[in-house]
Amino acid sequence: MWPERIKLIPPKYPVSRLEDMPEPNEESSGIDMQELKLRQRFMESGFNDNLKSHVGATGRYQIMPITGKEYTQITGKTGDLNDPVYNEQVRDFYMETRLPQFKVVSEGAPTDSVKIAKILAAYNWGPGNLSKHITRLKRRGVDVEKSLDWVDTMPAEPKNYVNFILRGQDIDKYRNNEEYQKALKKYGLK
């Protein structure tokens, strides 16, 4: 069972007991966004800024060309998706503006963790797939607004993606990854 609000678990060790979890800082959302971006980048590209997937997703955050074009049309900014700075700008734009349906819920405010989990799932699985899944869960009476238990009902890829980024699950697999360790040091997250 997920707690209502969580902080990202430091990569050194997974926290398994609720009472061991740090209290969220009142001034923040309870989510360390720098660590979240680092974990997301690791999941998307393994820190390979020039990675191109078989479906055409490019760069550190695996941006699809259509998303890059949409970013250019709306912002007027152009660039190469292989450019790490530009790729990150497109990712930030997409996360902040193109997934609004997962940020605000009319029936009671979801916790920050729930919002972030939905945005991550939509980023990885696609907003349409997530919307359909949430609709099915709500019909079955599953509360997707105040708990993160619904994350484990998704298919393996988006479930593992969200779990790794938010829970730090399977972090031991990656702890000895040289690129991950370099990035942790670079961002002072050792």
Walk through the language-model features, giving the residues of each.
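Non-catalytic cell-wall polysaccharide-engagement segments
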Residues: 2-30, 66-93, 97-190
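N-terminal targeting leaders of membrane proteins
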Residues: 27-29, 33-39
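Extracytoplasmic
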Residues: 35-36, 55-58, 115-116
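Structural recognition of the beta-strand scaffold that forms the well-ordered cores
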Residues: 39-42, 62, 119-122
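Amphipathic alpha-helical interface segments
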Residues: 43-44, 94
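Conserved alpha-helical segments that form or flank metal/cofactor-binding pockets of metalloenzymes
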Residues: 44-51
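Gly/Ser/Thr-rich beta-alpha loop segments that engage phosphate groups in nucleotides
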Residues: 48, 58-61, 128
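RNase H-like nuclease fold core
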Residues: 54, 58-62, 66-68
